[in-house]
């Protein structure tokens, strides 16, 4: 319950901060607020883009949540998504003549492998040298981004004249026009199935149980004989592979190409998403629609209402600042104070005679028993 309260307060305050920024930075606040809150649902194209972004947010949040469940924090999401998208664009820009499904599967496997290897380096350094995975993953991501930028601009630039993107993906590999059950975009459907598989892995498999135990209590994991070092490595590999899946779906689903800097901010958005959900897989999918709505609404406000500030950044900042606050602490202090006042009143008014003393002891024992029971429940 405390986690739910903290998450709800962080989200509400983040939305309030974004609304305040829109009012302060816009020349016409009413038009900007209307564009922010209503325009994402105004047309079918906006709704379709919202569903596509929700699928990407599910994959991103799964990557961040898998790292959190194993006791790690993967800050290299931007670089891992970027590398996977770049590899996908290179492998799918032309048809090889071996079957579309086979080529699509090879590109997917390569994208997952590249991102998983980048994350695996941080896991190995954590397991063998006890280095911080946050620092190593962030540094590797920071090193990969300018390297891929240079490759896109020089070697793999679109020969048709686009200076900031690779050649577009072959039309047969694009998921943008593909739909699945009830008209839901294919990206969101595939991402939901992946979320279901990851949730079953952590909840109903022996290896997933070991991952969760070693992530929460590594000393206990070592005591019972679990390979904690393997948890670090494979947890980061799984996190990187899911970030790579995000890059793959970004190229074949939403963008159709790999352009310079398309993954900027995705890693931190995924971390904010996972922190709000407290790494609960079942919460990630519905929460993805909220984050997709926020990003779509911010773009609509910037384009339609001439807003010069990307307010999604303020949402992420508010979440990072507020998610760690213990908002239930004041309520617990009030409960403790009320309990002390109750004990004082019982002591004052039940002091005369053996009958009153017995009644006082009984009242205090019943109150303490109820408090202990409610505390454990």
Swiss-Prot record:
GO cellular component: plasma membrane
Subcellular location per the Swiss-Prot or TrEMBL entry: Cell inner membrane
Record field: transmembrane: 4-24, 49-69, 72-92, 98-118, 135-155, 182-202, 223-245, 249-268, 274-294, 303-323
Membrane topology per record: Multi-pass membrane protein
Taxonomy, superkingdom: Bacteria
Main localization of the protein described in the UniProt heading: membrane
Entry annotated with the keyword Secreted: no
The UniProt record lists the keyword Nucleotide-binding: no
Keywords: Cell inner membrane, Cell membrane, Membrane, Transmembrane, Transmembrane helix, Transport
GO molecular function: transmembrane transporter activity
Similarity annotation: Belongs to the binding-protein-dependent transport system permease family.
Known role: Probably part of the ABC transporter complex RfuABCD involved in riboflavin import. Probably responsible for the translocation of the substrate across the membrane.
Subunit text: The complex is probably composed of two ATP-binding proteins (RfuB), two transmembrane proteins (RfuC and RfuD) and a solute-binding protein (RfuA).
Protein name listed in UniProt: Probable riboflavin import permease protein RfuC
């Amino acid at each position: 319950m405390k986690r739910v309260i903290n998450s709800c307060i962080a989200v509400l305050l983040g939305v309030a901060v974004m609304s305040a920024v829109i009012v302060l930075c816009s020349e016409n606040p009413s038009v900007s607020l209307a564009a922010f809150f209503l325009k994402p649902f105004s047309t079918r194209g906006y709704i379709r883009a919202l569903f596509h972004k929700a699928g990407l947010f599910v994959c991103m949040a799964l990557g961040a949540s898998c790292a959190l469940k194993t006791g790690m924090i993967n800050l290299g999401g931007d670089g891992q998504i970027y590398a996977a998208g770049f590899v996908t664009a290179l492998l799918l820009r032309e048809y090889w003549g071996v079957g579309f499904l086979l080529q699509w599967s090879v590109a997917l496997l390569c994208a997952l492998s590249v991102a998983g290897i980048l994350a695996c380096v941080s896991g190995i350094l954590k397991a063998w040298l006890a280095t911080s995975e946050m620092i190593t993953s962030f540094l590797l991501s920071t090193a990969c981004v300018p390297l891929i930028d240079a490759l896109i601009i020089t070697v793999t630039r679109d020969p048709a004249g686009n200076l900031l993107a690779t050649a577009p993906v072959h039309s047969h590999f694009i998921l943008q026009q593909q739909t699945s059950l009830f008209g839901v975009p294919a990206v969101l459907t595939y991402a939901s199935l992946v979320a279901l598989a990851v949730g079953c892995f952590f909840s109903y498999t022996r290896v997933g149980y070991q991952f969760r135990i070693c992530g929460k209590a590594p000393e206990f994991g070592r005591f019972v004989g679990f390979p904690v070092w393997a948890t670090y490595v494979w947890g980061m590999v799984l996190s990187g592979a899911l970030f790579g899946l995000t890059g793959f779906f970004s190229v074949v689903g939403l963008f159709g190409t790999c352009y310079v800097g398309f993954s900027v901010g995705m890693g931190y958005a995924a971390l904010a998403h996972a922190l709000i959900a407290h790494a609960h897989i079942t919460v990630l999918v519905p929460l993805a629609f909220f984050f997709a709505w926020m990003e779509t609404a911010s773009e609509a406000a910037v384009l339609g209402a001439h807003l010069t500030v990307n307010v999604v950044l303020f949402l992420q900042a508010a979440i990072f600042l507020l998610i760690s606050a213990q908002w239930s602490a004041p309520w617990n202090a009030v409960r403790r104070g009320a309990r002390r006042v109750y004990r004082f009143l019982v002591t004052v008014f039940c002091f005369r005679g053996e009958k009153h003393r017995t009644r006082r002891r009984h009242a205090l024992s019943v109150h303490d028993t109820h408090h202990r029971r409610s505390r454990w429940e």
